[in-house]
Each structure stands twice: as structure tokens, then as C-alpha cells.
Amino acid sequence: MGRGKIEIKRIENSTNRQVTFSKRRSGILKKAREISVLCDAEVGVVIFSSAGKLYDYCSPKTSLSRILEKYQTNSGKILWDEKHKSLSAEIDRIKKENDNMQIELRHLKGEDLNSLQPKELIMIEEALDNGIVNVNDKLMDHWERHVRTDKMLEDENKLLAFKLHQQDIALSGSMRDLELGYHPDRDFAAQMPITFRVQPSHPNLQENN
């Protein structure tokens, strides 16, 4: 007798359900890789667990977005709403703007000029002239700041040299006074009034007994 059909239904036990999900998920992703390699097929698989965790696989030579675009083109089903269309249009606009900027940059470098009209060449020339003026202005500002900085350093060096010179003069004066036997206490005694000077000890100056 043949095996009877087993009814496919939700597994109630959460532990058994998780184990089965893990095994079946691994099997599906393995089969997706095999058919992609063996048959050179474009395969994209997206799996969400009951907890919302994402598992996916995509053929190495493509991407899920490209596969979805091909699916939308071939099936005629619309996968993207207006919001996504608007976002896609904005991305295309930015890409186009970037391409135009790259072309303009090549023109400013003197590349790919043969296809340009005289009017376009004149506009490039004006842009280059304006750029030269701006560069010269920046260089002048830098030079002026450099001059001011040098002047400040020069003034500071002069002030420092003056202070060092003054200190040398003061030090030289002190050394000269020491060499000549100058003693500040003697000068102080000489400047005192006579009445306050200490008289030398002399027998004639002592009181008679």
C-alpha cells in the first residue's frame, strides 16, 4: 500500500515549529544555491520567520533589486507604489546631475572639447577666468596673513631682545660694583646725619669719673 497523504497544517508546538522552520529554511536556501550554480539561473529567495527575522539568498551575479525589476517587467505586476517611483525618479535625477558635473569637470580640464559649440567654449573660458580671480584673491589673503604674522613675530623678537639687553646692562652694573668693592651698607652710613653716626671708641671721649 502507498503512503497516505500527510495533511500540511500549522505546527502548534512552538519549539517543534521553530525546529522545523530552521531545517526547511536551510533546505530551501541550499536548493536555491544549487539551482543557481548548476543551472546558471538567476534566483532570489526572501524568507521571514514568524518573529519577523529576514533570511535571503540571491545569485552571485545579480541582486534582489534587479531580480524584482525583471519580475515586474515580465509579469506586468506593479511592485512599487508612487512613493517608490518618486524616490526612483529622484535617484535618476541625482545620477544625471552627477554625470553632467563630471562632463563639466572634464571640460574645465581641457578634455572632450571637440564636440562643444563656440558659445559653450566661451562659457568655459569665463568660468576659468572667474576661477583664476578667486584663486588669486585667496592667495593674496594668504600672503597678507603671512606678512602680518611675520611682522608680529619680528616685533616680539625685538621686544625680547630689548628686555635681554636691559637685563645684561643691569647685570653688568652689578658685577662692576662688586669688582670696585661697592657695599650698600657703607653708602647708607655715609648718607646718615652726623648726629646719628656711631662715634669711635676713644679715651678722651669717655666721661670723667
Swiss-Prot record:
> Which intervals of the chain form a coiled coil?
none
**Which GO MF terms does the UniProt record name?**
DNA-binding transcription factor activity, RNA polymerase II-specific; protein dimerization activity; RNA polymerase II cis-regulatory region sequence-specific DNA binding
Every copy of the K-box domain together lies at: 84-170
GO biological process annotations for this chain's record? cell differentiation; positive regulation of transcription by RNA polymerase II; regulation of transcription by RNA polymerase II; specification of stamen identity
* Chief localization: nucleus
Please report the stretch or stretches of sequence annotated as the MADS-box domain: 1-61
Extract one GO cellular component term from the record. Answer: nucleus
Q: Which domain of life is it from?
A: Eukaryota
Q: Which InterPro entries match?
A: MADS-box/MEF2_TF, MEF2-like_N, TF_Kbox, TF_MADSbox, TF_MADSbox_sf
Protein location? Nucleus
| Tissue localization of expression | Highly expressed in anthers and carpels. Expressed in pollen, tapetum and stigma.
UniProt keywords (A-Z) are: Activator, Developmental protein, Differentiation, DNA-binding, Flowering, Nucleus, Transcription, Transcription regulation
The record's function comment reads: Probable transcription factor involved in the development of floral organs. B-class protein required for normal development of lodicules (whorl 2).
Q: What is this protein called?
A: MADS-box transcription factor 2
